[in-house]
């Protein structure tokens, strides 16, 4: 009877012991399991790999950016050099174009004025030759002189100025020698006479002056040399006779 009564109690004790043993065998939440440790190690390794990969990517990106920057700087220097060269060429072209336009304008002006100068020459010759007599002729001559003066004033306003050449030394850049003659009064290459007036246009030669130039003193004639020699011989003979008489 005692054996049958104790059997349920023993079974309960056995069950409680089994439960306790199971609880003791079960790991607590505070103690990490081997699997958790392994998983953590794997995650840490993965994070380390990611960090290392990011660092490599950042370093590679920095090198690429630096290389790209150097390339852009070289391209900038090349383009800037090309721009400066093009700007200099354009400035030279602009200056050359302006100079060519000025030269063309001056050439057209010279051609126009050169065609007017013969008219001025005719006015000047007529003014010097006319000697009017009577009131009507003098009135006509006065009107003619006024017209000539008006023409000269217009030329002066355009920058035309006459040359003054008589008594000056001959200069082939200004004068054109048409005649040459000996002169006892003037040295060689001195302008004796103006045959056609020359003109300047704003400091440049518009038309050369046609002139007569001195050749300087000419050679002595043979007759004059003979007379001079004879007179010298006569003087010497007279001196000798005078000295003999005195002796």
Curated annotation (Swiss-Prot):
One Pfam family matching this protein: GrpE
SUPFAM superfamilies reported for this sequence: Coiled-coil domain of nucleotide exchange factor GrpE, Head domain of nucleotide exchange factor GrpE
Subcellular location: Cytoplasm
UniProt-annotated stretches for the region Disordered: 1-64, 214-247
InterPro entries for this protein: GrpE (IPR000740), GrpE_coiled_coil (IPR013805), GrpE_head (IPR009012)
Listed GO MF terms: adenyl-nucleotide exchange factor activity; protein homodimerization activity; protein-folding chaperone binding; unfolded protein binding
Keywords: Chaperone, Cytoplasm, Stress response
Disulphide linkage map: none
Composition bias, Polar residues: 30-39, 49-63, 228-241
GO cellular component, one term: cytoplasm
Biological process per Gene Ontology, one example term: protein folding
Complex formation: Homodimer.
Family: Belongs to the GrpE family.
Function: Participates actively in the response to hyperosmotic and heat shock by preventing the aggregation of stress-denatured proteins, in association with DnaK and GrpE. It is the nucleotide exchange factor for DnaK and may function as a thermosensor. Unfolded proteins bind initially to DnaJ; upon interaction with the DnaJ-bound protein, DnaK hydrolyzes its bound ATP, resulting in the formation of a stable complex. GrpE releases ADP from DnaK; ATP binding to DnaK triggers the release of the substrate protein, thus completing the reaction cycle.
UniProt-listed NCBIfam families: PRK14143.1
Protein name: Protein GrpE
């Amino acid at each position: 009877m005692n054996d049958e009564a104790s059997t349920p109690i023993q079974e309960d004790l056995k069950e409680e012991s089994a439960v306790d043993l199971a609880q003791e065998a079960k790991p607590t939440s505070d103690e990490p399991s081997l699997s958790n440790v392994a998983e953590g190690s794997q995650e840490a390794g993965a994070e380390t790999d990611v960090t290392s990969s990011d660092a490599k990517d950042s370093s590679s990106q920095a090198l690429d950016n630096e290389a790209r920057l150097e390339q852009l700087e070289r391209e900038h220097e090349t383009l800037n050099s090309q721009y400066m060269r093009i700007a200099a060429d354009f400035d030279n072209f602009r200056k050359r174009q302006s100079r060519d336009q000025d030269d063309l304008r001056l050439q057209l002006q010279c051609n126009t004025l050169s065609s007017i100068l013969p008219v001025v020459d005719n006015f000047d010759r007529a003014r010097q030759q006319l000697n009017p007599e009577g009131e009507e002729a003098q009135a006509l001559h006065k009107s003619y002189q006024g017209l000539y003066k008006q023409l000269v004033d217009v030329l002066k306003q355009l920058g035309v100025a006459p040359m003054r050449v008589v008594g000056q030394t001959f200069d082939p850049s200004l004068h054109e020698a048409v005649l040459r003659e000996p002169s006892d009064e003037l040295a060689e290459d001195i302008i004796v006479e103006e045959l056609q007036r020359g003109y300047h246009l704003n400091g440049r030669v518009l038309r050369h002056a046609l002139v007569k130039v001195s050749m300087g003193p000419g050679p002595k004639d043979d007759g004059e040399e003979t007379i001079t020699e004879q007179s010298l011989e006569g003087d010497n003979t007279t001196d000798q006779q005078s000295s003999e008489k005195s002796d």
